[in-house]
Amino acid sequence: VSAESTPEPGITEPVTTGPQHRGGGRRRKAAPGKRRKALLATAWAAAGVIVLAGTGFGYVYFKLNGNLKSVDINQALGDGRPTKVDNGSENILVLGSDTRAGTNRKLGGGTDDGSARSDTAMIVHVYKGHKRASVVSVPRDTLIDRPACTDAKGASHPAATGVMFNSAYSTGGAACAVKTVESLTGIRMDHYLEVDFAGFQKLIDDLGGVPVTTTRPISDPQSHLNLKAGTHTLDGERALALVRTRHGVGDGSDLGRIQLQQAFVKALLDQVAHVGVFSDPKRLYDLADTATKAVTTDSDLGSVNALADFAGGLKGIGSSHLRMVTMPVRYDPADPNRVLMEKAKAERIWQALRNDRPIPASATKDTAAGEAAGVVSG
């Protein structure tokens, strides 16, 4: 069974960035121009990030700029990282975090001690020319070797073997997550984007909901999700429940949840195109305000100008040029609730991305996969 979704041709604390200058249901088919503006391969932050390209200056600029939080990944990690490949491509680590701080506590995120884990992880590779992108989802239950990390309080954590992938974030925050991904892939992450549960939910509500079609019922009492087969417009609460459910459909695995997440990301991007946020100033501002409050970025993207420039560079990516796959894994013989990376097949993916090449189909063939493929579509 293929793990690929249906292909389509010390650490510093996050800081609030003040004003600064830039350094360095069935729907009508969206017009091509709108689709180009909408299709960013930035997972949870995608809809919010792209609307920043339309923000103005004055009060709006200062307000949105003041919302942003950033982490200086370069300073935190220093030397010893993979070499940056100057071939026109970009690699972005996108995390959905489940901290229980603030509003997220009501949404069931993180642990009771207030710590956080990366509930969702996607490596986004934007090819040279910014006309195509590949997204590789990393299962949170993957057992990996985590490098030594230093947390935000300056405490050192030794390297660990056979730990869950998502523990890197809870151990040392954003920089430890980046360091772990770079150790796993041998690819330098050019940027980092993180969005929390509360921000994701409000983003969907500000957008007016996201239409999806389910081919069979999805019921999960744990996440209070109950969808009949058919077409639904999901508000933020139900959208969040959908992308988090493990027990509502299929085998209850993280791999099935990833399939649902990937399908929802595509539906979300299509909805951004459909509603035409650029023609509605109030909706544009509301989305931008929500997005800038919800995201944490690397310091290079820590201003509205920088984030808008970054988003603007992705406007040429069409839906037929966005490919989403899952990192090749196999079930752990010692624990069926955990997976192990298929190193040889995964290396084909990492090598392809390092060389700015398409991911070969052989890399995701005959690997472990969930049972939710095709259950949800936009």
Model-derived features: positions:
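Non-catalytic, solvent-exposed segments at the cell envelope interface
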Residues: 2-378
